[in-house]
Amino acid sequence: DKTSIQMIDALLLEYSLDTQEGILLMCLAEALMRIPDSATADALIRDKLSVADWKSHLKNSDSVFVNASTWGLMLTGKVVGLSSNEQSAGQAVNRLVNKLSEPVIRKAMHQAMKVMGHQFVLGRSIAEAQKNGKSMRDKGFTYSYDMLGEAALTTADANKYFKDYLMAIEAVGRDTYVSSKSSPAPSVSIKLSALHPRYEVANEDRVLTELCDTLEQLLRRAVELDVAITIDAEEADRLELSLKLFEKLYRTDLVKGWGKFGLVIQAYSKRALPVLVWLNRLAKEQGDLIPLRLVKGAYWDSEIKWSQQAGFTDYPVYTRKEATDVAYLACARYLLSPSVRGNIFPQFASHNAHTVSAIAVMTEHKDFEFQRLHGMGDSLYNHAMEAYQQSVRIYAPVGSHKDLLPYLVRRLLENGANSSFVHRLVDARCPVAELTQHPVDMLLAFDTLHNTKIPLPPAVFPERKNSYGVNIDIESEAHQFEEQVKGFLNNQWTAGPVINGESLAESMIKADQNVEQVTAPYDRRINVGQVAFANLDHVSAAITGADAAFADWNATSVETKAAALDKLADLMEDNLAELVAICHQEAGKTIHDSVDEVREAVDFCRYYAKQADNLQGFELKGFDGQTRIASRQGRGVFVCISPWNFPL
């Protein structure tokens, strides 16, 4: 029943992310925390709230908090959106209300974010979090503390997070709290990107030395105080790097025989199950238990967008929520199997009642634990602990209000999403039968396993093919491509004027006319090739030739010109490796930047080829009733000077 739902749950239910108003509130709340001055904040409120239909939500909720919020939103949104006729009747009053309501809404939004912060964050400091968590520990629950904050951008950021994590380990290790019930010892979760400003595959050598040393210091203290450590999962491109780092530290004498150094695996990743198999083999070889938190995944929206922008052939994650749910159960079944028991200690993190029940049914032992987020799944896990007598650990973020935003937005997206189990659970309009459907049945009910509403990255543009990209952060893909590029690195390229379709480079180089050697900017000892520079005679000949060819080219159909651009795009993609090698050697670009440059050139060609429809002739009716045909004509010969930093 809605009346029993906490006020934040009621607000999220009424303004869910499948409504325009819910999306507006999310955008507004997210943006307001970034705006330092009141005037700009009020202008944003005035702009955003005037376009929504707040009246339709009035009295839909039984929550006084929600209805009061709706009245405030109506006051700001509707007054700003009044027509000129309505404004004329009481313009002065309306202006007064407008000025009053924007600051009120601003303060209310900031206060709402703080209220939601208390819902999802256990404390501003580790000491406050431990104090606030005592009531749950008295009930038998335990915690995994994590310090709020996103990726470090500087060494100073990384040093700050290092001190925060060290302080958390010290506090947890020295905690003298004794539970009246059997509450397992708390642990600490660590986000690797917070500990190094260059936690990326391109800087693998630095990560496996500098970040490894930093993490080793934290682990050393954790082992001394016997505080379990879990490495958080992050973006798909960092998966292999995180596994290399984990393996390097896991095989050291520092953690040998400890069995409390673990990590997080995300089930929405198509590589999740193979990674579990690899970790199981690693644990068998080393002989030490690996605690492993299995989650659904936290970066789905970003992974989809990044893959589309990068032009990958496919996505690293499943595109249907039902597929992720099935993958989670498949991973859970593997983790509970006899071949894994004793090697990996499963920690199942989920707020889906069906998932929790399925795990309880499929297991034949109790060597695992459940996990949930602070502020979510309270009633579910109160029941689970009582019904299954299984330990439950609460993932509890710790930090100040200013560090809350990114984490809070992820939680609101999870809670507010229309497909979220948590969202549907508190929605009285959702039939119970829908909540209890098996995810396998739900997945098989679709015609395709992939989500047809999410096109593959190559087909993301409706009017043209996306340019092809290479994921150089995935070893299996990067190794093959880098080998292709290496095959061209010793090439000696030549360049020179091309006049009337004929290259003069070879003849000019033989005659040593205006020839210069080209060397790599990153190492002048590397000779890339030779270039023969044009003189004034060449320039004149080129302009004369282009001018002579202009009439024929101008008469050429737009379709033929567009086909030439498409052909050029295809040829550049076919020769991607060599073009990347040239960009790398001649301009000193990284492989990643070189791939991006080729992709941009390809996309330009395809984009302008598709503009052909806009260049066709069209009819115009004159004032005399006569029909006239309007057409576009070429303007003549142009000189184009390409930018030095984008040579392709």
In which residue ranges do the predicted regions lie?
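Catalytic cores of nucleotide-enabled group-transfer and carboxylate-activating enzymes in metabolic
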Residues: Q111-K131, M136-D146, L153, Q217, ...
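Positively charged, amphipathic and often flexible ligand-engagement surfaces
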Residues: D1-Y468
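Structural signal for hydrophobic packing residues in well-ordered secondary-structure cores
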Residues: A29-P36, R137, I169, G173-T176, ...
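Terminal low-complexity tails and localization/encapsulation signals of metabolic enzymes
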Residues: G399, D403-P406, R410-T544, A548, ...
